[in-house]
Amino acid sequence: MLPTENRLRRREDFATAVRRGRRAGRPLLVVHLRSGDTDPHVTGETVPPPRAGFVVSKAVGGAVVRTAVKRRLRHLVRDRLAQLPPGSLVVVRALPGAGDADHAQLARDLDAALQRLLGGGAR
């Protein structure tokens, strides 16, 4: 489970990450990253932690499949939070094939997308 301070919850935050962030698409998922954004909801001089949110539509599958995909993605992102810049907003959108994919396939696509967004990969 993602720690509370690393969860993206507000609709405005999802919209900011998707509309103003950079995007990297893979066969199973799309990752939107808004780097180094200051959190308008937190006052003070502390550096906000990276926050992540997930979008899994009904095209992925039924409720049980969608929940399983969300849990897998949460677990994968939790292990990769240290790679993300402080204050960044990440939205991981699962594509229809994600429902049939195993953990390793999702991990491979997530790593490739993050690598591309964080400056390590070519288009």
Swiss-Prot record:
InterPro entries per record? Ribosomal_Su5_D2-typ_SF (IPR020568), Ribsml_uS5_D2-typ_fold_subgr (IPR014721), RNase_P (IPR000100)
Short name of any one Pfam family annotated for the protein: Ribonuclease_P
Sorted alphabetically, which Gene3D superfamilies does this protein's record hold?
Answer: 3.30.230.10
Q: Which reactions appear under catalytic activity for this entry?
A: Endonucleolytic cleavage of RNA, removing 5'-extranucleotides from tRNA precursor
GO MF terms held by the record: 3'-tRNA processing endoribonuclease activity; ribonuclease P activity; tRNA binding
Q: Which residues form the signal peptide?
A: none
Give the enzyme class. hydrolase
* Function recorded in the entry: RNaseP catalyzes the removal of the 5'-leader sequence from pre-tRNA to produce the mature 5'-terminus. It can also cleave other RNA substrates such as 4.5S RNA. The protein component plays an auxiliary but essential role in vivo by binding to the 5'-leader sequence and broadening the substrate specificity of the ribozyme.
Family of this protein? Belongs to the RnpA family.
The entry's protein name is Ribonuclease P protein component
**Which organism encodes this protein?**
Streptomyces griseus subsp. griseus (strain JCM 4626 / CBS 651.72 / NBRC 13350 / KCC S-0626 / ISP 5235)
